[in-house]
Regions:
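A short, structured surface patch at a secondary-structure boundary
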Residues: 183-245, 287-291, 295
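Bateman (tandem CBS) regulatory domains
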Residues: 96-103, 120, 175-177, 186-191, ...
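Membrane-cytosol interface motif
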Residues: 14-34, 147-170, 190, 195
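A hydrophobic, helix-centered structural microdomain
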Residues: 110-175, 209, 281, 286-302
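Acidic active-site catalytic centers that drive phospho-/nucleotidyl reactions
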Residues: 118, 202-203, 272, 284
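N-terminal hydrophobic signal-anchor/signal peptide
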Residues: 2-130
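C-terminal terminal-structure detector
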Residues: 235-302
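Short, glycine-rich, amphipathic interfacial segments at transmembrane boundaries or analogous
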Residues: 84, 90-91, 150-188, 249-268
Length: 302
Protein backbone atom coordinates (compact mmCIF):
# COMPACT_ATOMS: atom_id res chain seq x y z
CA UNK A 1 0.00 0.00 0.00
CA UNK A 2 2.66 2.52 1.03
CA UNK A 3 4.77 1.61 -2.00
CA UNK A 4 1.87 2.50 -4.27
CA UNK A 5 1.38 5.83 -2.48
CA UNK A 6 5.04 6.74 -2.94
CA UNK A 7 5.08 5.69 -6.59
CA UNK A 8 1.71 6.92 -7.84
CA UNK A 9 0.55 9.40 -5.19
CA UNK A 10 2.16 12.40 -6.84
CA UNK A 11 0.56 14.54 -9.50
CA UNK A 12 3.13 13.94 -12.25
CA UNK A 13 2.75 10.86 -14.43
CA UNK A 14 5.32 8.19 -13.55
CA UNK A 15 7.55 6.89 -16.33
CA UNK A 16 8.83 3.35 -15.94
CA UNK A 17 11.36 1.42 -17.99
CA UNK A 18 10.05 -2.07 -18.74
CA UNK A 19 12.37 -5.01 -19.30
CA UNK A 20 10.57 -7.43 -21.64
CA UNK A 21 9.49 -10.92 -20.69
CA UNK A 22 7.16 -12.76 -18.34
CA UNK A 23 4.25 -10.98 -16.68
CA UNK A 24 5.57 -7.58 -17.79
CA UNK A 25 3.52 -8.21 -20.94
CA UNK A 26 0.33 -7.81 -18.86
CA UNK A 27 1.06 -4.15 -18.05
CA UNK A 28 -0.99 -1.45 -19.75
CA UNK A 29 -0.56 2.31 -19.55
CA UNK A 30 -2.88 4.41 -17.38
CA UNK A 31 -3.29 8.06 -16.49
CA UNK A 32 -0.83 7.48 -13.63
CA UNK A 33 1.99 5.71 -15.46
CA UNK A 34 3.56 5.28 -18.87
CA UNK A 35 6.07 2.64 -19.92
CA UNK A 36 9.13 2.71 -22.11
CA UNK A 37 10.20 -0.65 -23.49
CA UNK A 38 13.90 -1.59 -23.47
CA UNK A 39 15.09 -4.37 -25.73
CA UNK A 40 18.72 -3.80 -24.73
CA UNK A 41 20.22 -3.41 -21.22
CA UNK A 42 20.77 0.36 -21.39
CA UNK A 43 18.72 2.72 -19.22
CA UNK A 44 19.42 6.35 -18.35
CA UNK A 45 18.31 6.99 -14.78
CA UNK A 46 17.37 10.60 -15.50
CA UNK A 47 14.78 9.50 -18.08
CA UNK A 48 12.68 7.21 -15.86
CA UNK A 49 11.33 6.95 -12.31
CA UNK A 50 11.95 3.23 -11.96
CA UNK A 51 12.60 -0.08 -13.68
CA UNK A 52 9.98 -2.83 -14.04
CA UNK A 53 10.82 -6.48 -14.69
CA UNK A 54 9.52 -9.98 -14.10
CA UNK A 55 12.32 -10.98 -11.75
CA UNK A 56 11.52 -14.67 -12.24
CA UNK A 57 11.50 -14.63 -16.05
CA UNK A 58 13.98 -12.06 -17.27
CA UNK A 59 16.40 -12.12 -20.22
CA UNK A 60 19.78 -13.24 -18.88
CA UNK A 61 22.18 -11.26 -21.04
CA UNK A 62 23.14 -8.00 -19.32
CA UNK A 63 19.86 -7.38 -17.49
CA UNK A 64 20.71 -8.68 -13.98
CA UNK A 65 23.79 -6.43 -13.92
CA UNK A 66 21.64 -3.55 -15.17
CA UNK A 67 19.16 -3.99 -12.31
CA UNK A 68 21.93 -4.18 -9.71
CA UNK A 69 23.65 -1.11 -11.15
CA UNK A 70 20.51 1.02 -11.17
CA UNK A 71 19.48 -0.17 -7.71
CA UNK A 72 22.83 0.98 -6.33
CA UNK A 73 22.29 4.35 -8.05
CA UNK A 74 18.99 4.75 -6.19
CA UNK A 75 16.68 3.95 -9.10
CA UNK A 76 13.83 1.75 -7.80
CA UNK A 77 13.41 -1.72 -9.30
CA UNK A 78 9.87 -3.12 -9.20
CA UNK A 79 8.54 -6.58 -9.91
CA UNK A 80 6.05 -6.39 -12.79
CA UNK A 81 3.44 -8.23 -10.72
CA UNK A 82 3.69 -5.55 -8.01
CA UNK A 83 3.02 -2.78 -10.54
CA UNK A 84 0.08 -4.76 -11.92
CA UNK A 85 -1.39 -5.13 -8.43
CA UNK A 86 -0.94 -1.45 -7.61
CA UNK A 87 -2.67 -0.32 -10.80
CA UNK A 88 -5.53 -2.85 -10.86
CA UNK A 89 -6.16 -3.93 -7.27
CA UNK A 90 -5.90 -7.54 -8.47
CA UNK A 91 -3.29 -10.29 -8.50
CA UNK A 92 -2.16 -12.19 -11.56
CA UNK A 93 -3.57 -15.66 -10.96
CA UNK A 94 -1.04 -17.29 -13.28
CA UNK A 95 1.80 -16.31 -10.93
CA UNK A 96 -0.16 -16.28 -7.67
CA UNK A 97 1.66 -19.16 -5.97
CA UNK A 98 5.10 -17.98 -7.07
CA UNK A 99 4.42 -14.55 -5.57
CA UNK A 100 2.87 -15.85 -2.33
CA UNK A 101 -0.73 -14.94 -3.11
CA UNK A 102 -1.80 -16.67 0.08
CA UNK A 103 -0.44 -13.61 1.84
CA UNK A 104 1.84 -12.94 4.77
CA UNK A 105 0.93 -14.30 8.22
CA UNK A 106 -1.53 -11.96 9.93
CA UNK A 107 -0.11 -10.31 13.02
CA UNK A 108 -1.82 -10.93 16.38
CA UNK A 109 -2.46 -7.17 16.61
CA UNK A 110 -4.35 -7.14 13.31
CA UNK A 111 -6.32 -10.30 14.13
CA UNK A 112 -7.37 -9.12 17.58
CA UNK A 113 -8.09 -5.56 16.49
CA UNK A 114 -10.20 -6.68 13.56
CA UNK A 115 -12.12 -9.17 15.68
CA UNK A 116 -12.74 -6.52 18.34
CA UNK A 117 -13.96 -4.04 15.74
CA UNK A 118 -16.24 -6.67 14.19
CA UNK A 119 -18.01 -7.29 17.49
CA UNK A 120 -18.08 -3.63 18.56
CA UNK A 121 -19.46 -2.36 15.25
CA UNK A 122 -22.16 -5.03 15.07
CA UNK A 123 -23.34 -4.29 18.61
CA UNK A 124 -23.19 -0.52 18.08
CA UNK A 125 -25.31 -0.78 14.92
CA UNK A 126 -28.13 -2.82 16.50
CA UNK A 127 -30.31 0.18 17.49
CA UNK A 128 -30.55 0.98 13.75
CA UNK A 129 -30.32 -2.44 12.14
CA UNK A 130 -32.73 -4.31 14.44
CA UNK A 131 -35.80 -2.18 13.53
CA UNK A 132 -34.76 -2.39 9.86
CA UNK A 133 -34.51 -6.17 10.09
CA UNK A 134 -37.94 -6.42 11.73
CA UNK A 135 -39.51 -4.32 8.95
CA UNK A 136 -37.72 -6.40 6.32
CA UNK A 137 -38.94 -9.65 7.87
CA UNK A 138 -42.52 -8.34 7.89
CA UNK A 139 -42.32 -7.23 4.24
CA UNK A 140 -40.96 -10.63 3.15
CA UNK A 141 -43.69 -12.52 5.02
CA UNK A 142 -46.50 -10.32 3.66
CA UNK A 143 -45.40 -10.74 0.03
CA UNK A 144 -44.32 -14.39 0.18
CA UNK A 145 -45.57 -16.39 3.19
CA UNK A 146 -42.98 -18.78 4.51
CA UNK A 147 -39.66 -18.55 6.37
CA UNK A 148 -38.23 -15.02 6.33
CA UNK A 149 -34.69 -16.28 6.93
CA UNK A 150 -32.70 -18.48 4.59
CA UNK A 151 -29.88 -20.63 5.93
CA UNK A 152 -27.34 -22.11 3.55
CA UNK A 153 -24.12 -24.03 4.10
CA UNK A 154 -21.12 -21.98 2.99
CA UNK A 155 -17.36 -22.53 3.14
CA UNK A 156 -15.45 -20.44 5.66
CA UNK A 157 -11.89 -20.03 6.87
CA UNK A 158 -9.76 -23.12 6.45
CA UNK A 159 -12.35 -24.67 4.15
CA UNK A 160 -14.71 -25.39 7.05
CA UNK A 161 -18.47 -25.26 6.30
CA UNK A 162 -20.84 -23.16 8.39
CA UNK A 163 -24.54 -22.16 8.16
CA UNK A 164 -24.76 -18.64 6.71
CA UNK A 165 -27.97 -16.70 7.39
CA UNK A 166 -29.69 -14.31 4.96
CA UNK A 167 -33.10 -12.80 4.52
CA UNK A 168 -35.01 -14.87 1.98
CA UNK A 169 -35.13 -12.92 -1.28
CA UNK A 170 -36.43 -15.72 -3.54
CA UNK A 171 -39.43 -17.98 -3.70
CA UNK A 172 -39.42 -20.85 -1.20
CA UNK A 173 -38.83 -23.37 -4.03
CA UNK A 174 -35.96 -21.41 -5.60
CA UNK A 175 -33.40 -24.21 -5.26
CA UNK A 176 -35.54 -27.27 -5.84
CA UNK A 177 -33.28 -28.10 -8.80
CA UNK A 178 -30.07 -27.44 -6.85
CA UNK A 179 -27.73 -24.47 -6.42
CA UNK A 180 -27.45 -22.07 -9.36
CA UNK A 181 -26.25 -18.54 -10.03
CA UNK A 182 -28.76 -15.69 -9.87
CA UNK A 183 -29.44 -13.88 -13.16
CA UNK A 184 -30.06 -10.14 -13.50
CA UNK A 185 -33.76 -10.76 -14.25
CA UNK A 186 -34.09 -13.94 -12.21
CA UNK A 187 -37.79 -14.91 -11.95
CA UNK A 188 -37.12 -16.63 -8.62
CA UNK A 189 -36.46 -13.27 -6.93
CA UNK A 190 -39.48 -11.61 -5.30
CA UNK A 191 -40.19 -7.87 -5.50
CA UNK A 192 -39.14 -7.34 -1.89
CA UNK A 193 -36.18 -9.61 -2.56
CA UNK A 194 -35.00 -7.47 -5.47
CA UNK A 195 -35.08 -4.37 -3.26
CA UNK A 196 -33.22 -5.86 -0.31
CA UNK A 197 -30.63 -7.47 -2.61
CA UNK A 198 -29.98 -4.17 -4.38
CA UNK A 199 -29.21 -2.37 -1.12
CA UNK A 200 -27.61 -5.43 0.58
CA UNK A 201 -30.27 -5.51 3.32
CA UNK A 202 -30.57 -9.28 2.83
CA UNK A 203 -27.08 -9.65 4.33
CA UNK A 204 -27.93 -8.08 7.73
CA UNK A 205 -28.73 -11.41 9.48
CA UNK A 206 -25.08 -12.33 8.93
CA UNK A 207 -24.28 -10.07 11.87
CA UNK A 208 -25.08 -13.20 13.88
CA UNK A 209 -22.42 -15.11 11.92
CA UNK A 210 -19.98 -12.31 12.71
CA UNK A 211 -20.73 -12.43 16.45
CA UNK A 212 -20.22 -16.21 16.40
CA UNK A 213 -16.81 -15.77 14.77
CA UNK A 214 -17.77 -17.60 11.58
CA UNK A 215 -17.50 -14.43 9.50
CA UNK A 216 -15.99 -10.96 9.62
CA UNK A 217 -17.51 -7.71 8.45
CA UNK A 218 -14.82 -7.61 5.74
CA UNK A 219 -13.36 -10.50 3.77
CA UNK A 220 -13.99 -12.66 0.70
CA UNK A 221 -17.65 -13.61 0.36
CA UNK A 222 -18.29 -17.22 1.48
CA UNK A 223 -19.37 -19.45 -1.39
CA UNK A 224 -21.74 -22.41 -1.54
CA UNK A 225 -20.28 -25.88 -0.99
CA UNK A 226 -21.10 -27.20 -4.47
CA UNK A 227 -19.64 -24.14 -6.17
CA UNK A 228 -16.45 -24.37 -4.08
CA UNK A 229 -15.94 -27.97 -5.20
CA UNK A 230 -16.45 -26.90 -8.81
CA UNK A 231 -14.15 -23.85 -8.63
CA UNK A 232 -11.40 -25.75 -6.82
CA UNK A 233 -11.23 -28.01 -9.88
CA UNK A 234 -11.64 -25.31 -12.54
CA UNK A 235 -9.76 -22.29 -11.13
CA UNK A 236 -6.14 -22.42 -10.05
CA UNK A 237 -5.41 -21.10 -6.53
CA UNK A 238 -9.12 -20.82 -5.64
CA UNK A 239 -8.56 -22.42 -2.22
CA UNK A 240 -6.26 -19.54 -1.19
CA UNK A 241 -9.30 -17.33 -0.56
CA UNK A 242 -10.20 -19.52 2.43
CA UNK A 243 -7.03 -18.57 4.31
CA UNK A 244 -8.87 -15.64 5.95
CA UNK A 245 -12.28 -15.35 7.58
CA UNK A 246 -15.04 -14.63 5.00
CA UNK A 247 -16.88 -11.33 5.16
CA UNK A 248 -20.21 -9.62 4.63
CA UNK A 249 -18.47 -7.23 2.25
CA UNK A 250 -15.05 -7.34 0.66
CA UNK A 251 -12.59 -6.01 -1.90
CA UNK A 252 -14.05 -8.15 -4.70
CA UNK A 253 -17.61 -7.00 -3.89
CA UNK A 254 -16.81 -3.30 -4.15
CA UNK A 255 -14.48 -3.62 -7.16
CA UNK A 256 -16.04 -6.38 -9.22
CA UNK A 257 -19.61 -7.03 -8.03
CA UNK A 258 -21.55 -10.24 -8.52
CA UNK A 259 -20.03 -13.15 -10.46
CA UNK A 260 -22.50 -15.25 -12.47
CA UNK A 261 -20.22 -17.83 -14.10
CA UNK A 262 -16.78 -19.40 -13.89
CA UNK A 263 -15.07 -16.70 -15.98
CA UNK A 264 -16.44 -13.91 -13.78
CA UNK A 265 -15.56 -15.92 -10.66
CA UNK A 266 -11.96 -16.20 -11.87
CA UNK A 267 -11.77 -12.42 -12.26
CA UNK A 268 -13.40 -11.95 -8.85
CA UNK A 269 -10.83 -14.33 -7.34
CA UNK A 270 -8.03 -12.04 -8.50
CA UNK A 271 -9.53 -9.32 -6.27
CA UNK A 272 -10.08 -11.73 -3.36
CA UNK A 273 -6.45 -12.85 -3.46
CA UNK A 274 -5.32 -9.23 -3.58
CA UNK A 275 -7.15 -8.74 -0.28
CA UNK A 276 -5.70 -11.95 1.18
CA UNK A 277 -2.22 -10.80 0.21
CA UNK A 278 -2.53 -7.18 1.36
CA UNK A 279 -5.19 -7.22 4.10
CA UNK A 280 -4.66 -4.45 6.65
CA UNK A 281 -6.71 -2.04 8.72
CA UNK A 282 -6.11 0.68 6.12
CA UNK A 283 -7.46 -1.53 3.33
CA UNK A 284 -10.41 -2.52 5.54
CA UNK A 285 -11.30 1.15 6.09
CA UNK A 286 -11.12 1.75 2.33
CA UNK A 287 -13.48 -1.20 1.74
CA UNK A 288 -15.95 0.21 4.28
CA UNK A 289 -15.98 3.56 2.43
CA UNK A 290 -16.45 1.85 -0.94
CA UNK A 291 -19.17 -0.37 0.52
CA UNK A 292 -21.19 2.69 1.52
CA UNK A 293 -20.92 3.92 -2.07
CA UNK A 294 -21.90 0.46 -3.33
CA UNK A 295 -25.00 0.36 -1.13
CA UNK A 296 -26.10 3.82 -2.26
CA UNK A 297 -25.66 2.99 -5.95
CA UNK A 298 -26.70 -0.68 -5.93
CA UNK A 299 -23.50 -1.59 -7.81
CA UNK A 300 -23.00 -5.28 -8.57
CA UNK A 301 -26.26 -6.54 -7.07
CA UNK A 302 -28.36 -9.40 -8.51
Amino acid sequence: FFGSVLLFGRRARSRLAVIPGGVARALTETSKVEYSGHSSPEITASDVDGVVADLHRMPVSGYPKLLAKNSLRGLPVYHAAFIYEVLTGRVLLDVACKLSASGRPLTPFYRWTKRGLDVALVLASLPVTLPLMLLTALAIWVESPGPVLFTQKRIGKGGKPFPMIKFRSMRTDAEKHGAQFADEEDPRITRVGAFIRKFRIDELPQFWNVLKGEMSLIGPRPEQVNFVKQFNEEIQHYAHRHSVRPGITGWAQVRNGYAADTAETRRKLSYDLYYVKHCSLILDVLIVCLTIKTILTGFGSR
